[in-house]
Amino acid sequence: MGESIMEQVEAIIAPVITEQGLELVDVEYVKEGAHWYLRIYIDKEGGVDIDDCTNVSHLVSEVLDKHDPIAQAYMLEVSSPGLERPLKKDEDFERFTGKLVRVLTKEAYQGYKEFTGYLVGLIEDDIVLEYEKEKMAIPRAIVDKANLTFEF
């Protein structure tokens, strides 16, 4: 056993999403008020549209009903990751090199828990950002979240 609900869900739905020519960006399972929500974020080159989200919602719903990894009732939501999409996989950090990102850490690092800068990339086990011509390497092990940041 040992797998978390999220790991089970990702393993079940990733092939379905990939078969549609889409990327599984993130999965969230959260309780808001009295209701549980399973949120699936998908993307593709050029972005996703409502038809992509509707199609994935139907396909994912079928496969999750078949495997039933979540015991309680939940609402399924499928959407684009938005402008401030999360960066999780190595490929995300490669793809968005040069973009403005925000990194939150689980613990203070060099006196801070929040960093914003242009993504230089991954170097070994560090996320490297550049801010005001200074480079900073943040250990990936202490990163809580990394997201693209919208530039005005």
Curated annotation (Swiss-Prot):
Q: Which SUPFAM superfamilies match?
A: YhbC-like, C-terminal domain, YhbC-like, N-terminal domain
CDD domains, alphabetically?
A: YlxS_C
Q: List cellular component terms (GO).
A: cytosol
Gene3D superfamilies, per the entry: Ribosome maturation factor RimP, C-terminal domain, RimP-like superfamily, N-terminal
Per UniProt, subcellular location reads as: Cytoplasm
Keywords from the named record: Cytoplasm, Ribosome biogenesis
> A single GO BP annotation from the record?
ribosomal small subunit assembly
- What is this protein's function per UniProt? Required for maturation of 30S ribosomal subunits.
Which family is it part of?
Answer: Belongs to the RimP family.
Q: What is this protein called?
A: Ribosome maturation factor RimP
Origin organism is Desulfitobacterium hafniense (strain Y51)
